[in-house]
């Protein structure tokens, strides 16, 4: 089983789900983490292009759609699982800036010495849509860092960025950081996460059963504890 989000989002949920599921079914789940997009060798599209052994992907729905269009994922296997939202974090021990209003959020961005965001959908949204819409693209570009191949939280924890932006589900279990909160509702972007079965899966029936389980109420608690909102 592949999971898409770097860091901890679906890995955390699956680590909660896997033991009971394995005991009940006798099916062993092997978890691997990988970015859902990007140029790194670890990114799911690049791993699938190398025909690595994969049965299921759990990833951003938009990225899953591309894999379906490329015939890498079975079209009718796609199931929506959880919603995620963008949060901001600072290094543990640092002052928590105010982002409760758009005015405060804007001031925090301008006052920050540095900020980091991922090279996945949340980071692309911030860099190419939100910051230009706020007329801050020029001011923020010089002090922004795009993170590839690891959690934005890890970069913040090392002190390499003052502010870090990523999905709440990706940030909430990273050590050494404190989550300030979600960015304001008026500029928030929901990311939908879905599951799909790989076209060359060696275990299609077992994969279908697991995807069905993840979309059932049995998995709701694990999904919520991972910072996601269940769809079903």
Predicted segments — roles?
Residues 58:
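Phosphate-/polyanion-interacting regions in eukaryotic proteins
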Residues 2-42, 49-53, 61-70, 75, ...:
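Exported/periplasmic ABC-transporter solute-binding proteins
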């Amino acid at each position: 089983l592949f999971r898409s989000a770097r860091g901890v989002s679906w890995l955390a949920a699956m680590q909660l789900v896997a033991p009971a599921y394995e005991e009940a079914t006798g099916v062993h789940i092997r978890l691997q983490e990988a970015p859902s997009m990007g140029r790194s060798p670890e990114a799911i599209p690049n791993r699938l292009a190398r025909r690595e052994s994969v049965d299921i992907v759990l990833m951003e729905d938009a990225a899953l759609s591309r894999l379906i269009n490329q015939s890498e994922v079975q079209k009718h296997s796609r199931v929506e699982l959880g919603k995620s939202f963008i949060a901001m974090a600072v290094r543990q021990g640092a002052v928590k800036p105010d982002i409760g209003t758009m005015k405060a959020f804007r001031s925090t961005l301008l006052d920050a010495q540095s900020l980091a965001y991922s090279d996945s959908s949340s980071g692309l949204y911030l860099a190419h849509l939100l910051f230009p819409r706020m007329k801050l693209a020029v001011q923020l570009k010089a002090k922004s860092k795009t993170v590839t191949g690891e959690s934005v939280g890890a970069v913040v924890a090392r002190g390499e960025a003052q502010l870090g932006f990523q999905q709440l589900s990706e940030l909430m279990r990273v050590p050494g950081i404190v989550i300030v909160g979600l960015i304001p509702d008026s500029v928030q972007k929901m990311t939908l996460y879905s599951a799909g079965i790989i076209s060359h899966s060696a275990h299609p029936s077992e994969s279908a059963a697991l995807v069905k389980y993840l979309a059932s109420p049995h998995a709701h608690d694990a999904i919520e504890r991972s910072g996601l909102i269940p769809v079903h």
